[in-house]
Amino acid sequence: MAPHQFKSKGAPTLVHVREAARFDRDGLIPAVVQDVLDGTVLMVAWMNREALERTLETGESWFWSRSRQELWHKGATSGHRQKIKALRYDCDSDVLLLTVEQQGDIACHLGERSCFHRDEAGDYDLPPADTLSQVFRVVEERKAHPHPDSYTSRLLEAGSNKILKKIGEEATEVVMAAKDGERVAEEVADLWYHTLVLLAHADVDILDVYRALQQRRR
């Protein structure tokens, strides 16, 4: 079977991966899996050489189960497959990094987006992603659990007209800042923040926006 062409700019060639990957004495190498949309770490699994070859050939994640002592195709049963967008190795060539498009936004067998959904205290807490995603999750938290001292909570409770008015005001301030050449970053941050509030109010996930942006790259 011909190798699947998933290589993106900056990723190593398939030949380099095959030659560079350093397997341990058990013939395994750890593979960290991250979401292409926002960089969230989804899971860590193990590959042997055959799992790596199948991943390269099919463009989907294959791993080696140490407990069952067999290959497994991620998502073959659940439907939560991982389409490889890029594959890299670290400076010592003994860890792989798979950047994937996660089908169904679920990587964990417990039904969570990430296997790392517990913090050091055992509380539910998804791992950090990019800054916009983190801010959006805070906005969602304010929506789910309003706080009287929170500007975000008050804005959400005020409704769409208030939110839309603020977005219009912030957009105007971005234009004025760009003309003056001052405070552009701060004003854009304000505009983005209020846009995130609108997304939460409209029950639109930021990952859907990222998917739309991915389409703009083509």
Curated annotation (Swiss-Prot):
Region: Phosphoribosyl-AMP cyclohydrolase, residue numbers: 1-131
Location of the region described as Phosphoribosyl-ATP pyrophosphohydrolase in the Swiss-Prot/TrEMBL record: 132-218
Compartments reported by the entry: Cytoplasm
E.C. no: 3.5.4.19, 3.6.1.31
Source domain of life: Bacteria
GO molecular function: ATP binding; phosphoribosyl-AMP cyclohydrolase activity; phosphoribosyl-ATP diphosphatase activity
GO cellular component: cytoplasm
Family matches, as CDD domains: NTP-PPase_HisIE_like (cd11534)
Pfam families referenced in this protein's UniProt entry, alphabetically: PRA-CH (PF01502), PRA-PH (PF01503)
Metabolic or biological pathway: Amino-acid biosynthesis; L-histidine biosynthesis; L-histidine from 5-phospho-alpha-D-ribose 1-diphosphate: step 2/9; Amino-acid biosynthesis; L-histidine biosynthesis; L-histidine from 5-phospho-alpha-D-ribose 1-diphosphate: step 3/9
Keywords assigned: Amino-acid biosynthesis, ATP-binding, Cytoplasm, Histidine biosynthesis, Hydrolase, Multifunctional enzyme, Nucleotide-binding
Keyword Acetylation: no
Gene3D superfamilies named among the record's database cross-references: MazG-like, Phosphoribosyl-AMP cyclohydrolase
Major localisation: cytoplasm
Reaction(s) this enzyme catalyzes, per UniProt: 1-(5-phospho-beta-D-ribosyl)-ATP + H2O = 1-(5-phospho-beta-D-ribosyl)-5'-AMP + diphosphate + H(+); 1-(5-phospho-beta-D-ribosyl)-5'-AMP + H2O = 1-(5-phospho-beta-D-ribosyl)-5-[(5-phospho-beta-D-ribosylamino)methylideneamino]imidazole-4-carboxamide
BP-aspect Gene Ontology terms: L-histidine biosynthetic process
Record family assignment: In the N-terminal section; belongs to the PRA-CH family.
NCBIfam families hit by this protein: histidine_hisI, PRK00051.1, PRK02759.1
PANTHER family per record: HISTIDINE BIOSYNTHESIS BIFUNCTIONAL PROTEIN, HISTIDINE BIOSYNTHESIS BIFUNCTIONAL PROTEIN HIS7
Protein name according to UniProt: Histidine biosynthesis bifunctional protein HisIE
Organism from which the protein derives: Gloeobacter violaceus (strain ATCC 29082 / PCC 7421)
Source taxonomy: Bacteria, Bacillati, Cyanobacteriota, Cyanophyceae, Gloeobacterales
Gene giving rise to this polypeptide: hisI
